[in-house]
């Protein structure tokens, strides 16, 4: 795509610094990704890249940012990959803005992704900063960086996930209804849950930690026997009653990951179904597993994952069980807040990031005001034109652009346009 750049004569280098930078991005072909053109990641990557793309492979994640495990590159004038975004930022630190530079140094503090999930990801959690530093020092090959990884998933399609521990009353009902849990952890330990109340938060955490750790630590032979028993019982009962959503999910998980302890542990987690345009966020040390659908995900710049089930990748069950916060309750679902015509903001309680969704009808226009921090823009639908004081660019599906700090953006659509902006959390940039 041709890019017409007009640098004002009186603006010089400062105007050029604020010019939008078109990016080429990295993809991951994890086996849980959707295949070929069924994958949103594939379709975005096909539009974003000049490479020959294999339509028979899974396309799981598109990474936009500076993490070394999946770097983005500036697009050169001839359309080829230039320097990495991180290298360019190192040479142009003012593009981050002073507050961001002082807080996080010369790097983008967030990582933006597109996910296309065909089958469940692992049951996992991400460490806080203290644990991340310890894990990275001890096992740098497994844990690639020393940062924490709070994150937010914004549904693009219907999106399903397991997220956080269910409320105490629901957990009591689960222990009563699923005898296989008691078989795995022992009746004395399982029955502890009936002796606690929500008012004693520390006791609740202690009991849930004990039960969950015993469950996840069961040996392979016992797990295989109990999962098979659970499967047989649910199939028999399905002839006489309608299974719950969670029970149907557990049978589906068992088909995909037979004999996996993650099948039974799913009963402990909230089963969340997001509609397009809804989001959930996850702090450090919170268990979760994405199940199906497509989403935009933004997180602190990290790739640290501790896994404990529903995967063929290496597990670290004891670390996961010891690191979890064991907070109980349904997660907050963000619907977004309309901040100006056509723009909805999703603002999680993390300094590193927020996401704006711009749904711009054909022929309409809007403005992203200048902010003292960097942004990444991703176009997922339609065409239009984007202008700043330094440039005027045509945009279309698959375009990814880096926006330097202090850059006001004017948008006009020539067809229905859907665009996402990931940036620094406004509460950090504009403290009260």
From Swiss-Prot:
Cofactor binding notes: Binds 1 zinc ion per subunit.
| Tissues of expression | Constitutively expressed in both vegetative and reproductive organs under normal growth conditions (at protein level).
Q: What happens when the gene is disrupted?
A: Endosperm development arrested.
What EC number(s) are associated with this protein in UniProt?
5.3.1.8
Binding residues annotated for Zn(2+), in chain numbering: 124, 126, 151, 288
Show the Pfam families listed in the entry. Answer: PMI_typeI_cat, PMI_typeI_hel
Q: Which cysteines bridge via disulfide bonds?
A: none
Report the source organism: Arabidopsis thaliana
rRNA processing as a keyword?
A: no
State what inhibits or activates this protein: Inhibited by EDTA, Zn(2+), Cd(2+), Co(2+), p-chloromercuribenzoate and L-ascorbic acid (AsA).
**Sorted UniProt keywords:** Acetylation, Isomerase, Metal-binding, Zinc
Q: Which family, according to the similarity comment?
A: Belongs to the mannose-6-phosphate isomerase type 1 family.
Q: Which residues carry this modification: N-acetylmethionine?
A: 1
Cofactor or coenzyme needed: Zn(2+)
Give the main EC class. Answer: isomerase
**What are this entry's molecular-function GO terms?**
mannose-6-phosphate isomerase activity; zinc ion binding
Q: Where is the active site?
A: 307
Free-text function comment from the UniProt entry: Phosphomannose isomerase involved in the synthesis of the GDP-mannose and dolichol-phosphate-mannose required for a number of critical mannosyl transfer reactions. Involved in the ascorbic acid (AsA) biosynthesis. Required during the endosperm development.
Name the chain's protein: Mannose-6-phosphate isomerase 1
What's a BP term from Gene Ontology annotated to this protein?
Answer: response to cadmium ion
Instruction: Point out the coiled-coil segments of this chain.
Output: none
Task: Tell me what turns on expression of this protein.
Answer: By light (at the protein level). Down-regulated by dark (at the protein level). Down-regulated by DCMU, an exogenous photosynthesis inhibitor.
The pathway is: Nucleotide-sugar biosynthesis; GDP-alpha-D-mannose biosynthesis; alpha-D-mannose 1-phosphate from D-fructose 6-phosphate: step 1/2
């Amino acid at each position: 795509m041709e890019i017409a750049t007009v640098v004002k004569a009186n603006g010089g280098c400062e105007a050029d610094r604020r010019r939008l930078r078109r990016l080429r991005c990295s993809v991951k072909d994890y086996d849980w990704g959707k295949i070929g053109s069924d994958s949103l990641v594939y379709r975005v990557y096909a539009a974003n890249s000049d490479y020959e793309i294999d339509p028979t492979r899974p396309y799981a994640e598109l990474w936009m940012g500076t993490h070394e495990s999946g770097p983005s590159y500036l697009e050169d004038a001839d359309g080829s990959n230039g320097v990495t975004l991180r290298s360019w930022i190192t040479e142009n630190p003012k593009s981050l803005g002073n507050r961001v530079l002082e807080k996080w140094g010369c790097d983008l503090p967030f990582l933006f992704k597109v996910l296309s999930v065909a089958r469940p990801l692992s049951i996992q959690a991400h460490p806080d900063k203290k644990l991340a530093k310890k894990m990275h020092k001890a096992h740098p090959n497994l844990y690639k960086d020393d940062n924490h990884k709070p994150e937010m998933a914004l549904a693009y399609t219907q999106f399903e996930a397991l997220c956080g521990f269910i409320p105490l009353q629901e957990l009591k009902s689960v222990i009563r209804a699923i005898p296989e849990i008691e078989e795995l952890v022992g009746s004395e330990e399982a029955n502890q849950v009936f002796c606690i109340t929500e008012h004693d938060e520390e006791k609740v955490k202690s009991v849930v930690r004990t039960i969950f750790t015993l469950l996840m630590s069961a040996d392979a032979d016992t797990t295989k026997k109990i999962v098979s028993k659970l499967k047989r019982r649910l199939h028999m009962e399905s002839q006489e009653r309608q299974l719950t959503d969670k029970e149907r999910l557990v049978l589906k998980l068992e088909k995909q990951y037979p004999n996996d302890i993650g099948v039974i542990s799913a009963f402990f987690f909230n089963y969340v179904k997001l509609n397009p345009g809804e989001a959930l966020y996850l702090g450090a040390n919170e268990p979760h597993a994405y199940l199906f659908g497509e989403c935009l995900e933004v997180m602190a710049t990290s790739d640290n994952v501790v896994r404990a089930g529903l995967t063929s990748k290496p597990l670290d069950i004891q670390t996961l069980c010891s690191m979890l916060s064991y907070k109980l309750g349904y997660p907050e679902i963000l619907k977004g807040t309309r901040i100006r015509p056509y723009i909805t903001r999703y603002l999680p309680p993390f300094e590193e990031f927020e996401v704006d969704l711009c749904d711009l009808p054909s022929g309409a226009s809007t403005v992203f005001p200048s902010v003292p921090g960097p942004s990444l823009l991703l176009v997922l639908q339609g065409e239009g034109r984007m202008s700043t004081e330094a440039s005027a660019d045509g945009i279309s599906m698959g375009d990814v652009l880096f926006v330097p700090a202090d850059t006001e953006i004017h948008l006009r659509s020539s067809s229905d346009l859907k665009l996402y902006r990931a940036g620094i959390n406004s509460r950090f940039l504009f403290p009260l």
